[in-house]
């Protein structure tokens, strides 16, 4: 996809050069000219940009990596095959009712990089889909919850193991095992619990 007007405006504000998708077969030339590649959520694992980045030794980042780089306010995360949006909404509502100013972000209507623009927010409740987790350099949120696991999104991930590995990344950046919220009744989630 070509960047829209909003993406172009963001790029100008951040001093980022946007580059259009190259002709098929020329990904290596393009990726070899950049320091980092930032992937939009949902780009399939089979996309040629990943092979080109590996070959060139170029880091592949997710929009959450940029948000973490630019903002250090607390982030709470929820992942799972089902129920993410409901739990994110409930957690955000509970935090708001306790006096915190939070923004639901991530796989919601608001990307985390947009949510961090709000200077009034105390924290962010991130709906962490496998699309966001799978290509993040290092996902960081605490606490982080994994609700459940079932086969899904095999049109985006290389296989079921890649989908599972993406979900498990929700706990990579927690400070302590006590920051992991795990549904131990789900055998896949339990197998990854810290």
Predicted segments with their positions:
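Glycine-rich, highly charged phosphate/nucleotide-binding loops
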Residues: 14-30
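Charged, low-complexity, helix-prone segments enriched in Lys/Glu/Asp/Gln
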Residues: 9-10, 19, 71
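Glycine-centered loop/turn motif at secondary-structure junctions
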Residues: 12-18, 57, 99
């Amino acid at each position: 996809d070509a960047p829209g007007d909003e993406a172009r405006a963001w790029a100008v504000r951040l001093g980022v050069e946007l580059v259009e998708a190259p002709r098929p077969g020329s990904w290596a030339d393009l990726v070899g000219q950049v320091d980092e590649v930032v992937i939009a959520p949902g780009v399939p694992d089979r996309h040629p940009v990943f092979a080109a980045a590996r070959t060139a030794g170029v880091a592949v980042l997710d929009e959450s990596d940029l948000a973490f780089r630019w903002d250090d306010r607390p982030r709470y995360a929820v992942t799972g095959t089902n129920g993410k949006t409901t739990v994110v909404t409930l957690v955000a509502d509970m935090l708001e009712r306790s006096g915190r100013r939070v923004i639901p972000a991530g796989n919601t209507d608001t990307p985390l990089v947009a949510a961090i623009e709000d200077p009034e927010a105390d924290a962010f409740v991130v709906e962490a889909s496998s699309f966001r987790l799978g290509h993040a350099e290092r996902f960081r949120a605490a606490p982080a919850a994994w609700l459940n696991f079932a086969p899904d999104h095999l049109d985006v991930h290389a296989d079921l193991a890649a989908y599972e590995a993406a979900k498990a990344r929700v706990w990579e950046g927690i400070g302590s095992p006590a920051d992991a919220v795990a549904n131990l009744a789900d055998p896949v989630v339990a197998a990854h619990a810290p």
